[in-house]
């Protein structure tokens, strides 16, 4: 929350002053609609990308490093503002091509184990792999704390871990 109100960059502004304009949606739902097609970016972007876009364009500040404490902290803070909102990620219109690419990757068998995301997150959700209960693959709970990481990690860190695990 402190980082949310911290003035940074050449424009002398904080994320709290510029974020809704950059995100193109109200703060109370932003965590439930990203990733989404972003008009100014002209493509589908993640919440982390819109945070850095705001920092660079509206604040004149340096972007946060992807897995930095600041990025994870501000992402968690912003997602908390959407707690209770129904997940409503648009997969039609200008977002449809990105959705179809993601869907193809989700079902594509990869690696030495010849597995897809669906093998765990559809066929085995609710079961355990070692000490981890498999989810349905929803990402709206990220960033999240994992004991294995001894800290908070992003969706993208989890993706990297899954891909590494299937070799």
Model-derived features with residue positions:
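The canonical Cys-X-X-Cys-His
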Residues: 8-23, 74, 102, 112-125
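Short, flexible helix-coil linker/hinge segments at the edges of structured domains or between repeats
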Residues: 29-33, 40-43, 134-140
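N-terminal Sec/ER secretory leader and immediately downstream segment
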Residues: 1-37
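Short, intrinsically disordered, charge-biased short linear motifs at domain edges
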Residues: 2-7, 99-108
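Post-cleavage N-terminal segment of exported redox proteins
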Residues: 34-103, 126, 148-167
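Long compositionally biased, domain-poor regions of proteins
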Residues: 1-2, 135, 161-164
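An amphipathic alpha-helical core segment
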Residues: 118-145
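Short, compositionally biased low-complexity segments
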Residues: 17-28, 44-52, 127-134
